[in-house]
């Protein structure tokens, strides 16, 4: 039987937790669980890390009533994603978020993969989803989530100031991208 013909055993979030508990996966392994399949994430480079650091500093000050989480799990239908940043309502320490006010993916080489996540974030009720395309110096902003995806998608470039739905201070694209 060819692999393409064989049934696939899909993992659950609980399966992955047991794998971590057994030492099969390490907590620091960079994976996402998409439709029950573990997907390796690209290791962050210098540009990616600098952009995430800038956004983290900005969001902590701009959204004081929320938690800013960096590369943490967001539970979604069929698994979990690990966005670069998310702004969530405060939760008890033993709970992972299943939605967010804002999710940001910083893309240096992963633009196409990050674009495929939009429908998952919309179905999870994420109010805003941003894809920061570092090489293109643009930010694609998705708003108005629904079952079929986001109803409003706009692209912003150098010189733009993007308001944050939960924040008090807009993001200056030029300052963010250096």
Model feature map: region roles:
Residues 1-178:
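Gly/Pro/Ser/Thr-rich low-complexity, intrinsically disordered segments predominantly at protein N-termini
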């Amino acid at each position: 039987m060819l692999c393409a013909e064989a049934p696939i055993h899909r993992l659950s979030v609980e399966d992955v937790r047991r794998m971590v508990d057994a030492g099969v996966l390490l907590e620091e392994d960079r994976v996402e669980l998409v439709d029950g399949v573990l997907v390796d994430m690209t290791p962050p480079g210098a540009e990616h890390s600098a952009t995430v650091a800038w956004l983290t500093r900005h969001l902590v000050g701009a959204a004081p009533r929320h938690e800013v989480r960096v590369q943490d799990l967001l539970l979604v239908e069929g698994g979990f994603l690990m966005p670069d940043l998310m702004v969530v309502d405060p939760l008890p320490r033993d709970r992972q978020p299943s939605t967010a006010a804002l999710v940001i993916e910083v893309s240096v080489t992963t633009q196409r993969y990050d674009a495929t996540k939009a429908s998952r974030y919309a179905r999870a009720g994420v109010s805003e989803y941003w894809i920061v395309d570092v090489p293109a110096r643009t930010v694609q902003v998705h708003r108005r989530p629904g079952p079929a995806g986001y109803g409003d998608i706009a692209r912003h470039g150098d010189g733009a100031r993007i308001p944050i739905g939960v924040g008090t201070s807009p993001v200056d694209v030029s300052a963010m991208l250096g």
